[in-house]
Amino acid sequence: KSVLVTALTNRALMEVAGKSSLSEVIQNKQVYKTKITSDESKEIPSLQLEKDVTPKKGCIVLATFFVSSGLAAELASETPFDYVIVDEASQALLAMLGAARLLGKQVVFVGDTNQLPPVVQLKKSKIRDNNYLRLVEGLDAVTNNGAMPLYQLTESFRLCNRAVSYTNFFYNGNLSSKSKMRFADIPNLFFMHKEG
């Protein structure tokens, strides 16, 4: 099977490539990325350079939203990848989510509508007046119509208990911490308690 993983930034793609679950395919030179910098080459030496975003059987291709959307615009009728994974999908415009559907036979959107939405440099009045709201809502627009199954993670492995207690304001108390990290009290450092 061929897999495309797409995200807003190259840094996000490097985070994906750095996951321990991918170490074997990285070492076997089965992970390709567009536009590898010298720092990225040092960080993950076995990462392969991908000049054109093309499916490779048994491999993972990493490309930004910008690069992936360019490929989608060039497609005629074929769907090149078996799977497309859109990481940080809450940051994608609706057009990018649509492009992902053109690129993959199966598509997984990984994102959280409670997190950073797409960054748009238009005034809200212009968005409203030109009827662009659905376009800039991105993942919200896709998830609100009920056309696909949704899953909400309830455990965080990065956030310690204190951080989860603040974050739970947005998650109605449904998030719990599984982090092994513990918060150290630092004298003379002030925190606003979540209860006010």
Regions inferred by a protein language model and the residue ranges of each:
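Conserved helicase motor core of SF1/SF2 NTP-dependent helicases
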Residues: 2, 7-18, 66-69, 78-86, ...
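A short helix-to-beta-strand connector/capping loop
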Residues: 27-29, 56-59, 145-149
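Short, composition-biased local secondary-structure segments
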Residues: 59-75
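A generic local structural motif
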Residues: 45-50, 69-74, 94-96
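Active-site regions of enzymes building and remodeling cell-envelope glycoconjugates
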Residues: 24-30, 41-48, 83, 188-191
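Conserved helix-turn-beta segment of the N-terminal RecA-like "Helicase ATP-binding" lobe
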Residues: 11-41
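Conserved motor-coupling elements within RecA-like helicase/translocase cores
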Residues: 40-61
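Alpha-helix termini
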Residues: 23-25, 75-76, 142
